[in-house]
Curated annotation (Swiss-Prot):
Alphabetical list of InterPro entries matching this protein: Catalase_peroxidase (IPR000763), Haem_peroxidase (IPR002016), Haem_peroxidase_sf (IPR010255), Peroxidases_AS (IPR019794)
Tryptophyl-tyrosyl-methioninium (Tyr-Met) (with W-98) crosslink residues: Y227-M254
Domain of life: Bacteria
Residues that bind heme b: H269
Protein's recorded name: Catalase-peroxidase
Amino acid sequence: MNDQTPIGSGCPVHQPGGVRSLLGRTNKDWWPDMLATEILTPNGPSNPMGEDFDYAKAFKSLDYYALKDDLKALMTDSQPWWPADYGHYGPFFIRMAWHAAGTYRTADGRGGANSGQQRFAPLDSWPDNGNLDKARRLLWPIKQKYGNKISWADLFILAGNVAIESMGGPVFGFGGGRVDVYEPERDIYWGSEDKWVNQGVQTRIDPAKGMETIEGPLAAIQMGLIYVNPEGPQGNPHDDEGMARDMKETFKRMAMNDEETVALTAGGHTFGKAHGNGDPSLLGPAPAGSDLAAQGFGWVSSHESGGIGEHAVTSGIEGAWTNTPREWTENYFRLLFDYDYELVKSPAGAWQWQPINQKEEDMAPAAWDPGIKVPTMMTTADMALKRDPAYRAISERFRNDHEAFKDAFARAWFKLTHRDMGPKVRYLGPEVPDEDLIWQDPIPAGTKPSDAEVQAVKDKIAASGLTVSQLIKTAWASASTFRKSDFRGGANGARVRLAPQKDWEVNEPAMLARVLDTLDGLRGSLSMADAIVLGGVVGLEKAIRDAGFNVAVPFTGGRGDATQEQTDVESFEVMEPEADAFRNYVGKKKLAVKVEEMMLDKASLLGLSVPEMTVLIGGLRVLGANHGERGHGHFTRRSGQLTNDFFVNLLDMTNVWKAVEGSNDQEYVATDRTTGGETWRATRADLIFGSNSELRAVAEVYAENGHEEKFVRDFVKAWTKVMNADRFDLA
């Protein structure tokens, strides 16, 4: 986190004069409100590794400790094209790893280091990621050497770990398993601003209205920042209250509490320096807008030195935080508290704080010449650790108990760099910690039931009186919390029976409690997690039989049951759906985006394709899975049977649709063209399958004569995919 805000990032788009783009105006240019169905088709043919490549298998063949040795050697192998500060690249790689992981946000689980997105626009060209293109390029010889045995995503984080270790710092462990993608992720919302932080863009917090004014699911304070503006809110270094507010809110949205925030800030700033010893106007465009000959390098300086070493400019802030910038020491807190500070401007014009009357022994060596002494500095964000009462109390405790600080930093760094990897069962490598951590959403290992045990429980559920609707709703409520973004949620653990999920409005708590109580009494030796999914199998197979088909629904047991003590309630609260198109549910909160767009977002998090989303919506409607007794989209006279009636009746041209007056275009009614009588009611999440051309094309397939059984089989396949989405033990 050493360099947050490059000042001269330049325009991210470069178009030589007189040359048109290949495609011209896109559909989205002509119709900005067009549904972005492309987010459900990510990372397809662009992946050169092919579908058969097994990264976990490749990683297990890696000479892990030889790789670590090579990384350690790189730390002090300074290159003339980008010299190492203090002769050590460690701080540079810490910042690279931090910024790879630091884009994570809890609201939707997106961002983070998991897929190596820092290699692609917009992240490779964010102002806050200035000059990290050089850090990645320094790693290339090592990546080239070890090939597909180590992903870029894993290499970024491991390089950060080795950097800390090589400077005497503490680490808690490392888990591999991050799989690279080969194009920018299409399903992530970074904000609607059209200017970067250094181009006058406003903060996302309205102080008059409170911290919640940051638009969900965003976490960073301004466009192009990982966290906060280190100079202060809106660049105002005098706003102490605002600085602490910004830090607390943005770190909270990235899954960090106050203690973790202090530990990460102080620990990260124990190392290295910020760069602002030059004129930012000399910097060229960011990588995404740089010249072809630059070969992916951005922020190239026209300074006679090339803007490297002594003259490097990144954030604009200049200097080291401590007098020992390549060692893990206690000096960060000592210098922060032992000195009074005055506000100064760096050579690049950025606000920073300098110790008053600093002793020579407390000054830092110049990064380019250890024989020169220069003052240390603190950013406005650092000063918040001293000036904010809550942060100060934690900082003073850490200053007086360095072992506690070491442990807190190591654990916070591990959480920062692994938060988006899901449960520990996904971790690879010899340095995975044994300890289970609550933010990993631990689940006790399950026991796979025998076929006889499964059949016995199926028979009991079938005779219990539970309806198809109840069984389908309960299984969906349990499994559909899964997010492929950070691998949280899902049916394993049966957390639908625990707080907070058991009380979510979307889950119909009273109905849910009755069904769970019944299943608990019938499950025998099966886990509740297995019983819930098996209940869905029973309901679905009945619906299939009643529709006249003979299609089995797969079931693989072996799920475990989490306890309330293993469940961080606050971290799960952010996962409560504001809307769920699969259940035709819209909560009381005013939505920031359209229901049909939230449907795509949910489908994307579930890892569904357009056909999978479409077949699930159509099937769930006729199975009675709507929230409550809502009849919208229930286009069938054969409720509880798995038929294609939803699509047949949606596409029936005898219906004329109109928005219900006063519904703000959220509800619609169909009338018969001939009689004028009401036939159906629908929501936006229903009619979009007849309105949007891509979704209609798929809906037509499922409405065609002869495709009735195809619809059933496709529904079963998509349903099973969701039920097993978090079964990493089956991979």
